[in-house]
Swiss-Prot record:
One of its GO terms (molecular function) is 2 iron, 2 sulfur cluster binding. Pathway: Amino-acid biosynthesis; L-isoleucine biosynthesis; L-isoleucine from 2-oxobutanoate: step 3/4; Amino-acid biosynthesis; L-valine biosynthesis; L-valine from pyruvate: step 3/4. This is Dihydroxy-acid dehydratase. Binds 1 [2Fe-2S] cluster per subunit. This cluster acts as a Lewis acid cofactor. It holds the Pfam family ILV_EDD_C. Functions in the biosynthesis of branched-chain amino acids. Catalyzes the dehydration of (2R,3R)-2,3-dihydroxy-3-methylpentanoate (2,3-dihydroxy-3-methylvalerate) into 2-oxo-3-methylpentanoate (2-oxo-3-methylvalerate) and of (2R)-2,3-dihydroxy-3-methylbutanoate (2,3-dihydroxyisovalerate) into 2-oxo-3-methylbutanoate (2-oxoisovalerate), the penultimate precursor to L-isoleucine and L-valine, respectively. Mg(2+) binds at D81, D123, K124, E494. It is an enzyme of class 4 (lyase). Its EC number is 4.2.1.9. Homodimer.
Length: 619
């Protein structure tokens, strides 16, 4: 049987000092020998998705201690991408993922914790904790803070649903009055929780369900609903059950690397494509797979993107549905159920919601609203919004009058009635992106699936914003924003402002945008990111010139710079002749701190998940 990791610091005469310190944290004589469960919280008053998490660790701890464990909580940092957006703060967002992963590893290994509960919610926090959990490979359960309620307001006597992106677009649209813009701003983010659409935070929290590492409802149950309390309590109970299975029964199926196996990554990708998740999820799934030592790559994502239909359309791809509507339709388990019936899901994989010996098939039998016989489960998925602004968790217990089980015209569709037979994400490749790039097809208008235009090149997001707002960009342009990749930014900024401003100027369907940076989960339109190799790594995107013809063909999965090989070779020679200034932006003024320079030294391009280049760290 595996020995408790915590025994290293709690057993033997030579650990008297460590035990004395444990006692000072509240550990009693009869507690020694119990498993120590780390609770990685991410409470902060900076982030609406985390502002309500302060007491969540205590909830989880109470369940752990009742089940016979010792619970010890610590905190990680959490960056709000929306607040950091549009200025130098965004350089820190993606690098914070690595810091979060490292900080969880540091705390868990320094104190020899036996298992882990991750309380996450927003964009880089869930991926960072996921990377750490798979790196550590000790029993783990994820439980997030939950989504925000959708905003609602009246404009021209019409009630509309809103989210963060609506506020940004309205503010940049000169046709929207100051009064209406302010009204939208005040209504867009009414409660605590992760932003209400299928943006990065909610996408990742949904994916933890598909990976098998969080409980049903984790990705969709509203932060404000009282039913979410039970998810935190059950996370504590479940992690103790997993801990006992591993340490007392030598059941390695309780470990995260055996749960989040290759098949589980395929399941998560199928879900991602079916629900039109944020393109950032590709980055984070690739990074998590490397930590899990699973050989899951962009090629696998490309392969699956050609097989999986688009079954669930949510804001920002449509104003009709938000996460509260996804939950009413059955949440992640509802989408997985449709994927299973379409023959696109592995159900023989372990899941933290399954009892010992169980698997995803048994979880779906209970939690898929289209097949369950459990009325409590149906009531669970009828939990709805209250429409009352608040920063408090569990502050309401409203319910929808009925489930949305309309698989023909509802929020979640069956394969037969899919929003499209093409999935919500696609991998494109060609001479402009030899190692691939990503487009969220769920947000692309059908008229733009094939697009040919002239390059309008910018060396930074700031210059692109100035060009768009200043009228340089016109219909038919392909806006190219380069040197914003993991190494070149550094930090791979999100390009939500450029895409929002294109929309506000009426160019959302008339232009394309290509970048080696990334996009907010709130982005829609013909926005192609993660171009690899990035400009700073010698990618072709660095060689594009104004006026070059760029050809995009999403159905054919291709992206081409219509310049001859000989011309490109000549441009590459010219670039290399710049010596130390080769593959660096011309004329860009940007302060890059030592912390960001350290990140850039080890960063890989997006096709590798923008993780550290391990070859530079090997002995």
């Amino acid at each position: 049987m595996p020995k408790l990791r915590s025994a290293t610091s709690t057993e033997g005469r030579n650990m008297a000092g460590a035990r004395a310190l444990w006692r000072a944290t509240g550990v009693k004589d009869n507690d020694f020998g119990k498993p120590i469960i780390a609770i990685a919280n991410s409470f902060t008053q900076f982030v609406p998705g985390h502002v309500h998490l302060k007491d969540m660790g205590s909830l989880v701890a109470s369940a752990i201690e009742e089940a016979g464990g010792i619970a010890k909580e610590f905190n990680t940092i959490a960056v709000d991408d929306g607040i950091a957006m549009g200025h130098g703060g965004m350089l820190y967002s993606l690098p914070s993922r690595e810091l979060i992963a490292d900080s969880v590893e540091y705390m868990v290994n320094a104190h020899c914790a036996d298992a882990l509960v991750c309380i996450s919610n927003c964009d880089k926090i869930t991926p960072g904790m996921l990377m750490a959990a798979l790196r550590l490979n000790i029993p783990v359960v994820f439980v997030s803070g939950g989504p925000m309620e959708a905003g609602k307001t009246k404009l021209s006597d019409k009630l509309i649903k809103l989210d963060l992106v609506d506020a940004m677009v309205a503010a940049a649209d000169s046709s929207v009055s100051d009064e209406d813009s302010a009204k939208i701003e005040r209504s867009a983010c009414p409660t605590c929780g992760s932003c209400s659409g299928m943006f990065t935070a909610n996408s990742m929290n949904c994916l933890t369900e598909a990976l098998g590492l969080s409980l049903p409802g984790n990705g969709s149950m509203l932060a404000t609903h009282s039913d979410r309390r039970e998810l935190f309590l059950e996370a504590g109970r479940r992690v103790m059950a997993l801990t006992k299975r591993y340490y007392e029964q030598d059941d390695t199926s309780a470990l995260p690397r055996n749960i989040a196996c290759f098949k589980a990554f395929e399941n998560a990708t199928a879900l991602d494509i079916a629900m039109g998740g944020s393109s950032n999820t590709v980055l984070h799934l690739l990074a998590a797979a490397q930590e899990a030592e699973v050989a899951f790559t962009m090629d696998d994502i490309d392969r699956m993107s050609r097989l999986v239909p688009h079954l669930c359309k949510v804001a920002p791809s449509t104003p009709k549905y938000h996460m509260e509507d996804v939950h009413r339709a059955g949440g992640v388990m509802g989408i997985l159920g449709e994927l299973d019936r379409a023959g696109l899901l592995h159900t023989d994989v372990p899941h933290v919601a399954a009892d010992a010996g169980g698997n995803l098939k048994s979880v779906l039998a209970k939690y898929d609203v289209m097949q369950t016989q459990d009325d409590n489960v149906k009531q669970f998925f009828m939990a709805g919004p209250a429409g009352i602004p608040t920063t408090k968790a569990f502050s309401q217990d409203c319910r929808w009058p009925s489930l949305d089980d309309d698989r023909r015209e509802g929020c979640i569709r069956s394969r037969e009635f899919a929003f499209s037979q093409e999935g919500g994400l696609a991998v494109l490749s060609g001479n402009l992106a030899e190692n691939g790039c990503i487009v969220k097809t769920a947000g692309v208008d059908e008229s733009n699936l094939i697009f040919v235009g002239s390059a309008r090149v910018y060396e930074s997001q700031d210059d692109a914003v100035a060009g768009i707002l200043g009228g340089e960009v016109v219909a038919g342009d392909v806006v190219v924003i380069r040197y914003e990749g993991p190494k070149g930014g550094p930090g791979m900024q999100e390009m939500l402002y450029p895409t929002s401003y294109l929309k506000s100027r009426g160019l959302g369907k008339a232009c394309a945008l290509i970048t080696d940076g990334r996009f907010s989960g709130g982005t829609s339109g013909l926005s192609i990111g993660h171009v690899s190799p990035e400009a700073a790594a010698g990618g072709t995107i660095a060689l594009i010139e104004n006026g070059d013809r760029i050809e995009i063909d999403i159905p054919a999965r291709s992206i081409k710079l219509a310049v001859s090989d000989a011309e490109l070779a000549g441009r590459r020679e010219t670039m290399l002749a710049r010596g130390p200034m080769a593959w660096k932006p011309v004329g860009r003024e940007r302060f890059v701190s030592m912390a960001l320079k350290a990140y850039a030294m080890l960063a890989t391009s997006a096709d590798k998940g923008a993780v550290r280049d391990r070859s530079k760290l090997e002995d």
